[in-house]
Amino acid sequence: MKNKAIYPGTFDPITYGHIDILTRAAGMFDTVLLAIAASARKNPMFSLEERVALAKEVTQHLPNVEVVGFCELMANFAKKQQATILIRGVRSVSDFEYEWQLANMNRHFAPDLDSVFLLPSQNLSFVSSSLIKDVARHDGDVSTFLPEVVATAMLQKLGKR
C-alpha cells in the first residue's frame, strides 16, 4: 500500500525551512502533496497561483512531490486526496501547542488522518515566512533563507528590484 502525505501551509513565500521539512518528508513517504492554502484571511503577499508556481519551481528536484493549491477544510481535502498523513514543521514549544490543537481538530473530522511533526534543521529553526517578509521590507538580506527565484519575486513585489 502506498502512503500519501500532505504538507499543508500558506507558504507565503516558500522558504528553505519549508524545503528542509519537505525534502525529509519526501524521503519518508511514497508521495507528498505540498498543499498550498489560499489563506485569504492572512492577506498573503503572493496570490495562490504565484505561490503554487514558485513552489513547483523550487521543488522540481523532488520527484515524489506534487504541488497543489486548495481552499477548503484540510481534513476534507486530505480525504479527497486519499492521504492519511499530515506533515507539520514544529520550530518551538509554542508551535507545538498550536499544532497539537490543530492535529486533534483534524482527527475529529478525519479519524484516519495522522499528524507527523518534523523539526527543522537547527540552522533553520528560527525561519518563518512572516519574519522573512518583515526583514525584506526593511531592506535586510533574505538570500540565505529563500531560493533565489523566490527572493527575486519577493523583492519585485516589494518594489525593491
UniProtKB/Swiss-Prot annotation:
UniProt-annotated location(s): Cytoplasm
Catalytic activity: (R)-4'-phosphopantetheine + ATP + H(+) = 3'-dephospho-CoA + diphosphate
GO MF annotation list: ATP binding; pantetheine-phosphate adenylyltransferase activity
Single biological process term from Gene Ontology: coenzyme A biosynthetic process
Cofactor: Mg(2+)
SUPFAM superfamilies: Nucleotidylyl transferase
InterPro entries: Cyt_trans-like, PPAT, Rossmann-like_a/b/a_fold
Binding locations of ATP: 10-11, 18, 89-91, 99, 124-130
Pathway: Cofactor biosynthesis; coenzyme A biosynthesis; CoA from (R)-pantothenate: step 4/5
Residues reported in the UniProt entry to bind substrate: 10, 42, 74, 88
Top-level enzyme category: transferase
CDD domains per record: PPAT
Site positions per UniProt: Transition state stabilizer: 18
GO cellular component: cytoplasm
Subunit structure: Homohexamer.
Its job: Reversibly transfers an adenylyl group from ATP to 4'-phosphopantetheine, yielding dephospho-CoA (dPCoA) and pyrophosphate.
Similarity comment text for this entry: Belongs to the bacterial CoaD family.
Annotated protein name in UniProt: Phosphopantetheine adenylyltransferase
